[in-house]
Each structure stands twice: as C-alpha cells, then as structure tokens.
C-alpha cells in the first residue's frame, strides 16, 4: 500500500507487522543484546525503563516499543538499536522494507527533526497562492499588507476612559510584528489568549492573511519559541468532505506522508497552532451530534472536530486563530473559550497604491490605472477590500489592453461586480443565448450553495448535473481545486471568491422573478424576510440584490442575461424596507409561556449583534441602489435612523452620508455608543528642530479632520433634510465638535440636537455652544444629559441669551444643584431669551431652586416649565 494513501490505522498496522517480523527473526542472544542497547537509547529525553524490558520476549517488546514511541518511530528506533547491537544484516533488511512501506520520512525520530521537516514542507506547499484567475503567484510577492485593529469590543470601552481626546489603539499594518502581537494580551496584566478571532467583511483578505501567517511561521518569523506545528483548517472544505475522519487524520493530510507520529505531535497541545479559516460557515451542532469531539483519534464528522477545537474541549491548551465574517462573530462567541478579537480593515490608501503596482507588470499602466481610480473618490474608497481591488485592476487591465476608455466606472460593489462579469465575457469573446443560459445556471448553482450552509465547494457531479462542466462560464468564473482524499484525489470547483458567489446568488433571485411574470416575487420576499440567523448569513446577498435593482443595473441584466425583471420586484423590495419601521412581535394581548421566555432568553445574546448591525446593513442596502428617489421613499417610513455600538469606518460614513443626503423632511439620526474617534494608521515621524521652526514660521497648523466632517458638510447643503441629530453615549473629540459647530451655524433643516450621556471636553462644549448661539442656527430644541452640567452652564447661558430660535431646552435626568439653577434662571429671565419650554423630568431640585424657577415663571408667564422628580 502506498504510504500517502494509507489511513492512520493502516500505517500503524504496517509498522507493527514490520516490528514483529524483525524481532521474531532474532536469536535469544541477539534479543538479549537488543534489550540492553534499547535501555540506553533515549528519544526526546525518554527511554523505556529496564524493569519493563528485562524479561520481555519479541511480542512484549513490540507492544512496549509501540506504546512508548508510537508505531512508525518505533520502527526507526528498532533499526538504530539493531545497528548498535551489531545485528546489521537484520537492520539493513528492515530499512529497505521501512522505506518501501512507510515512506522516506519514517527514518526521522525526534520531534525536532519532524518539526524541521514539516516547516520545509509548509514552505514548499504554500510558497505560491492561486489568484482568482487561477494564475499562481508567490505569496510574498502578491501579499499586500492590510490594516489590523483591535476588535469592535473596544468601542464600548471608550466610554470608560478619562475625559479628553485619547487616540484609540491604531490599526496596524499586517507585518510580522503585528501578527506576533495577536496572541498577546491587551495589556500587561491580562493573560495571553489561546483563541484569536480575526474578523472582517467578505473579500477583505482574511484567508490570505491566515495563509501568510502560516507561511511566516514556517519561515521562522512568527511564534518561533511558542509553536512547533501549525495546521491550516479550511472549515468549508472540511464540512463538505464525505465520511468520518479524526483530527489525527486531518493533521496527517497536511504532513508530507501519513507515516508521521501524529500521537506524539498532538501530545503537546500547548505547542500547536490551528488556523480555522471561515468559521462563519459552521452551523450549530445537530441534536444527533450534540457534544463536540474530545478525542483527537475519534473518527467523526468534520463539524464535531471543528466544534471541539473551537470550544477547547479537543486538545485544550492549543492555540487557535479563527477567521470569520463580522455577522457570525456573535454566533461564535458562545462556542469559543475566552477569545480575543482583532479586525481586518483592508488596505490603507498607501497599500492600495502598492497593490496596483504589484498587479500591473507595466509601471506606466499601473500609474495610469491608479491615477484614474484615485480621482474617483468613491471607487477609490471601495478598493479598501482586496477582492474589489482585484476586480477593479482586472477590469482596468482589460480596458487598457484593448485601448478602451476608462470613463465607465462604478460607485458601488454591485456595479463593480456587474462590470467585471461583462468585461470577462467580452475579453473571452463569449456571448449569445447559450452563454446567457449558462450564466443563469451558474447563478442557480451559487444560490443553492449559499442556502446550503454557505456551500462553497462543488463536485464534478454537481456541475455535470447542471451541464456546467467544461462550459465557458465554468472556465471563467470557477476555480478548479484538488483535495487529497484517503483513497483518491477529489476534484472540486469553487467560485473565484465567496462574495462573488453571493453576488450571483442575488442575481438568481431576479432571474427567477423574470421567469414568472405577473406573480409575486416569492424568492425575493423569502430572502428579505428570512430569520435573524439566516439574515446574517445572507446579508451580503441582500445588499447585492438592492444594488441590482438600480435602473442601470436592471438594464445591464437585460442586455447580458436576455431578460427583463418585472417592475413589481423593485416595488415589493421598497415596501419591505418601509415595513421595517413596524416592530415584529406576538399579537397584542398574547401571553408568553415560561418555556417560550426561556428560549427567547437563550437566543437573546446570540441575536443581539445581528439586531444591532441591522440598521447599518439596511443603509448599505440603500446605498447600493444609488437612486435618490428610492432611498428617500424607503426612509420616509423610517423616521429615525439608529446606529448602535458601531465603530464607524470610512466606508460606513460614506454610506451614512449618502443616505442622509437623500433623506426626506423630518428625518432623525441617532448614534448610540458609536466610535467617533479617528485612529491614525501610522505614527508621524518626528521632525528635526530646524524643520519644526521653519514649519511654524511658514505654515499655520490645520485643525484635525474628524470622522463626521463629510456628514457635517452634507448637513449644510440645501438638499439635506435631516431635522434631528441625537448623539448618545458617544465620545465627541474636539475635532468632531468643531465640525459639528460649523454645521450648526448654517444647517438649513436641523431643528433638534441631542447630547445624551456623551463625553466632551470644555473646548468641545464651547465650540458646540458657539454654533448653537450663531444668528443663522436653526436648532429649536436642545436636549442635554451630560455627566457634569456645571462645566457647560456658562456656555449654555450664552446660547439662551443669544439664540433667536431656541424654544425648547430639555435637561431631563440631569443633576441640577443650586450653583447651576441660579445662572440658568438668570438666563431665562433675559429679555433676549426666546425659550418657550423647559423640561426637567426626573430631576431633583432644592427648595431654593424651586423658588428661583417660580420667579422665572412669574416674570415670563409664556414659558412652560415641565418638572417632576
């Protein structure tokens, strides 16, 4: 039997047979010499005690050798002891059989020797990666550094920090230093985590980063003194493999051959690293497999093995690096043991340029393509996602080679993907009804995979069934992959990227609707009305669906797929968005059973993250349409946009800004516990004293740009109808307050501002009140709940005395001691104070303060004071 194809148990059986045949060949005198020499033959510092060897016959010796060394290393140990015992003829015959039946690596003995051999094997296997077009490139040449930052849990932590403008831990570029930091604690006091979750959106480069970590480990750059063996586990592939396999089998799949001492490798879990790529594809364990696997030698389903690793019940103490999408992080939390999160944020602007120049071999073409994309601000922003960057480069390369105009660009991910399809088909010279039919079938395959627990691997039989095997679209849009199996190598196919599969899945819903005109878009409605867990899985598919409903997108679908999507699909989708303003729940008056309440409590934590992200995800869907009328109609039934506990990225703000531009009259925006502190990508180099002096003489220091500047600028435009802005439990740096102050001065539609439990400096308070007191400020209602109003009262007095339009001041829930009430009442009596309503709900006031307020009421009878404890 060939060593590479043998299972773990069959290799052990072959080793046992070799040992038995060899030792039975020895005479009693030779066996005696063998036992004495074996006593003095330690392996990794251990040897079999003499008391267990002294009276052992050949059969006993075989059992003890296997028990102590494992089967395959026991064969090599036996051969070496035979040589030292001067039984060279038997040793020579054993070596021949050993190499023939167990493979060349069976002559290795110590773990350190296997470790060195394994690193060399990993370097050979992973030196090159396949691009989406199946071209192999060196990983060091193609890998472009990404930004990696602490996980989103840090957003809430900002509220607990000291007042001021501390810069959060900045995003770091993914070099070896950053990768080495992943398994360190967040601070000096915390212990080193065993599980690190690397999260990010689709196409952001999680898999490439994970493979680069494996490659750098093998090159001796990462975890050198901590990890002896590192294994890459693609979750999607392991879930789809038929049959049962143990963790030991999965480890042997990655070794040069199956004769390796897997038990000894797994015997020290604290020296192992498992990279679980794509853990968002893991479903929950079915009732038939309720418990995770705990035995590395137990043959079971891939799901149980992976679940055992995630929960640290299988090989406790091993290090885990888990990659997943944002939407799945909440579902995984309950299955992970004390994880530490890190977030991949994609390319920095500097790294986008590096990627372009790595992609284009011609420097002039690279410069032209990069300059063109850089001038298109929206398209340039989209290129922070590596897969989108690759698509943009691929399309531009084709257009440059064909001498075409680069003017046709895209503003959304959907339009970029659609342009990619058309460009690839044109470059391949394929068109016509046959290819259109193949594309439809390919979309169906993509959709079936997405709905089947995000199935990403498709067999040759799957393609044959749909008549796609050997088709033109298979060659262009699917990558062929060979997976070594127990008996034979299995050939599978997968889409060039999972996000591209989700794009085609979204397209299939529209193509399905076209086939049944005049009937409700059942497939589309089923997608939109899926439950919370499925909605998280289908978030990107839903986003693409909205993008395809763009008028231009529908026209392209008609041109390239030969179909017309019914008008009612777009109208039904709009009605679905408008229906999101109505909370779903049990009928009024319905009573919940205790069992139902228990189930809801158990699911509450799991669904919390999906619910929190739904508001932002809905905005992304609207953004993808790039149709102002559609967005305005959609938001008309969503009077308040709520974003809660979101660390806003530049792309998030681009999306939010666009939706605010399109919002209808009376629109409100509420940001709750959102991260608004900009993190610098790179520390500035210190200038010399001479340069600093020259700079101070020639230039004036520019105020820092805040994350909210684009939104603040939008608020000042005549077409923006945002009426209410509530900032709750947010840290507001001075830069944000400065930009917001400028917006308050001239925003034509803003009528209400809320600052609820938000953290500001004195400078920030002064800036905001300056904007509120500006003659052209249109804010009529000001709601304030700040930790210490004593710091703001002097600025608030100025606003009350100078603002011509402020009519409502809500200080409900605030602490108002006499030192605050006294100047407040003086300002209310001021002749230029135009206030009509003062709300003091849930406020405790002293007797003196109540008398002061009564005096204000007497002098200004039109002022309504609402007070309750």
Curated annotation (Swiss-Prot):
Recorded phenotype for the gene knockout or disruption: Knockout mice are born at the expected Mendelian rate with no morphological abnormalities. They are characterized by spontaneous intestinal hyperplasia, inflammatory cell recruitment, exacerbation of chemical colitis induced by exposure to dextran sodium sulfate (DSS) and develop higher tumor loads in response to a combined treatment with the alkylating procarcinogen azoxymethane (AOM) and DSS. The colitogenic phenotype is associated with altered microbiota and is transmissible to cohoused wild-type mice, both early in postnatal life and during adulthood.
UniProt cross-references to InterPro entries, sorted A to Z: DAPIN, DEATH-like_dom_sf, LRR_dom_sf, NACHT_NTPase, NLRP_HD2, NLRP_innate_immun_reg, NOD1/2_WH, P-loop_NTPase
Post-translational modification as stated in the protein's UniProt record: Polyubiquitinated with 'Lys-63'-linked chains, promoting the interaction with PYCARD/ASC and formation of the NLRP6 inflammasome. Deubiquitination by CYLD decreases the interaction with PYCARD/ASC.
Region (Disordered): 350-354, 577-608
Binding site for ATP: 200-207
Ranges annotated as biased composition (Acidic residues): 596-608
Limits of the Pyrin domain: 37-128
Gene Ontology biological process terms in this record: acute inflammatory response; acute inflammatory response to antigenic stimulus; antiviral innate immune response; defense response to Gram-positive bacterium; defense response to virus; host-mediated regulation of intestinal microbiota composition; necroptotic process; negative regulation of canonical NF-kappaB signal transduction
CDD domains: Pyrin_ASC-like
Inducing factors: Up-regulated by rosiglitazone, a PPARG agonist, in CT26 cells. Down-regulated by CRH during water-avoidance stress.
Keyword ATP-binding: yes
Example GO molecular function: double-stranded RNA binding
Tissue: Highly expressed in the gastrointestinal tract, predominantly in colonic myofibroblasts and in colonic epithelial and endothelial cells. Within the intestinal mucosa, highly expressed by goblet cells. Also expressed in hepatocytes and in immune cells, including CD4(+) and CD8(+) T-cells, dendritic cells, mastocytes and peritoneal macrophages, as well as in lung, kidney, bladder and gonads.
Subcellular location field: Cytoplasm; Inflammasome
UniProtKB keywords: ATP-binding, Cell membrane, Cytoplasm, Immunity, Inflammasome, Inflammatory response, Innate immunity, Leucine-rich repeat, Membrane, Nucleotide-binding, Nucleus, Repeat, Ubl conjugation
Protein origin, superkingdom: Eukaryota
Family: Belongs to the NLRP family.
Function as written in the Swiss-Prot or TrEMBL entry: Acts as the sensor component of the NLRP6 inflammasome, which mediates inflammasome activation in response to various pathogen-associated signals, leading to maturation and secretion of IL1B and IL18. Inflammasomes are supramolecular complexes that assemble in the cytosol in response to pathogens and other damage-associated signals and play critical roles in innate immunity and inflammation.
Subunit structure: Homomultimer; forms the NLRP6 inflammasome polymeric complex, a filament composed of homopolymers in response to pathogens and other damage-associated signals. The core of NLRP6 inflammasomes consists of a signal sensor component (NLRP6), an adapter (PYCARD/ASC), which recruits effector pro-inflammatory caspases (CASP1 and CASP4).
Description of its domains: The poly-Lys disordered region (350-354) mediates the formation of liquid-liquid phase separation (LLPS), an essential step for nucleation and formation of the NLRP6 inflammasome complex.
Protein name: NACHT, LRR and PYD domains-containing protein 6
Organism of this sequence: Mus musculus (Mouse)
Taxonomic lineage of the native organism: Eukaryota, Metazoa, Chordata, Craniata, Vertebrata
Annotated gene: Nlrp6
